[in-house]
């Protein structure tokens, strides 16, 4: 499974989310590959996954089918809960 992190360099909420997301993924020791997707540079991926706002984080299975997503900033507690049943 993969974690698709849609962001933009100019997006302050994206900048705030990134280290917290990395920390939670590392703590959980999940078998997930994180892929950072710069929304401005990869519009095709944004269209494919219907990303309308950033930050957006999408978990996809090995066939690139969406499992779950969230949009906006999350606290560390929220992220732990989000990844708890993956």
What are these regions (language model features)?
Residues 59-86:
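Non-catalytic, surface beta->alpha helical segment in thiol-disulfide oxidoreductase systems
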Residues 15, 22-26, 80:
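Class I S-adenosyl-L-methionine
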Residues 6-20:
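Conserved redox-active cysteine motifs that mediate thiol-disulfide chemistry
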Residues 49-58:
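Structural micro-motif
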Residues 6, 21, 25, 29-43:
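Thiol-based oxidoreductase modules, predominantly thioredoxin-like and allied folds used
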Residues 37-39, 53, 72:
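Conserved strand-loop elements at the edges of beta-sheets that form or border functional pockets
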Residues 46:
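A hydrophobic alpha-helix adjacent to the NAD(P)-binding/active-site core of NAD(P)-dependent oxidoreductases
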Residues 1-3:
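Extreme N-terminal starter segment of soluble prokaryotic enzymes
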């Amino acid at each position: 499974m993969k974690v698709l992190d849609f962001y933009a360099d100019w997006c302050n909420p994206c900048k705030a989310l990134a280290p917290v997301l990395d920390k939670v993924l590392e703590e959980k020791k999940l078998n997930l590959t994180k892929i950072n997707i710069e929304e401005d540079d990869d519009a095709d991926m944004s269209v494919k996954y219907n990303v309308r706002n950033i930050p957006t984080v999408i978990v996809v299975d090995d066939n690139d089918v969406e499992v779950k997503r969230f949009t906006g900033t999350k606290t560390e507690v929220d992220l732990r809960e989000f990844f708890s049943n993956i």
